[in-house]
Regions:
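A recurrent flexible, glycine/aromatic-enriched loop bordering the glycosyltransferase active site
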Residues: 41-52, 95-96
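Conserved donor-nucleotide/metal-binding helix-loop-beta segment in metal-dependent transferases, i.e.
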Residues: 15-45
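Conserved N-terminal catalytic core of the sugar/cofactor nucleotidyltransferase
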Residues: 1-3
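Conserved alpha/beta core of the MobA/IspD/sugar-nucleotide pyrophosphorylase nucleotidyltransferase superfamily
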Residues: 55, 76-154
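Short aromatic/hydrophobic "clamp" motif used to bind/position activated sugar donors
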Residues: 8-9
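N-terminal glycine-rich, Lys/His-bearing helix-loop that initiates the first secondary-structure elements
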Residues: 154-180
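Conserved nucleotide-sugar donor-binding
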Residues: 5, 52-64, 107-111
Length: 180
């Protein structure tokens, strides 16, 4: 508001490997069309850690007037995703790489990202370069992903742990709660 911004590009701090070319593609779609919200997270196809969102400041102001939950205020784009009043577009790629984890939430994520940086001779590498590195080192990526998921799982409260376990055995995990 202070800067009279009309549009907001949201890239969170846990996504240090963002590919500027991907940002440019998403911005181009946003600029050339009449969308309120464009992202690559509605239907995941990019690695976790390549999360990009663009939305209008006007829609953010409108959301601010109606949002009351603490969760919505903290993660305002969740409202954009579920609202039918928001004209949205999801940018995705045909090849699904959503199983690749290159986000920075745990010390293991940091260790993997450090290995990615050390693999390249300079800081100018793309998502394609990371994916090529992934294909040559899938066991490395999978090991760090598993370690990070174990830490994140330990942080969940008991109810969330039960639901998470149920999802592995029951389609959707929701039947667990209908039986209680």
């Amino acid at each position: 508001k202070k800067l009279s911004a009309k549009h907001i590009l949201r890239i969170t701090g846990d996504c240090p490997l963002i590919d500027p070319r991907l940002v440019d593609k998403i911005l181009k779609i946003y600029k050339e069309n009449n969308f309120d919200y464009v992202s690559n997270i509605q239907r995941r196809s990019f690695p976790d850690g390549m999360d990009i969102e663009v939305f209008s400041f006007k829609k953010l102001q409108e959301a601010n007037k109606i949002l009351i939950s603490k969760s919505d205020r903290e993660h305002v784009t969740k409202y954009f995703l579920r609202s039918d009043k928001i004209k949205k577009y999801n940018f995705f790629q045909r090849k699904d790489y959503s199983n690749i984890r290159i986000t920075l939430d745990t010390k293991y994520d940091f260790q993997l990202i450090d290995k990615i940086f050390n693999n390249f001779n300079n800081f100018y590498f793309s998502l394609d370069d990371i994916i090529e590195f992934y294909h040559k080192n899938t066991l490395l990526f999978d090991r760090y992903k598993k370690l990070s998921e174990q830490i994140n799982f330990q942080k969940l409260d008991k109810g969330q742990q039960i639901w998470q376990e149920a999802k592995n055995f029951i389609a959707g995990g929701n039947m667990l709660f209908s039986k209680r």
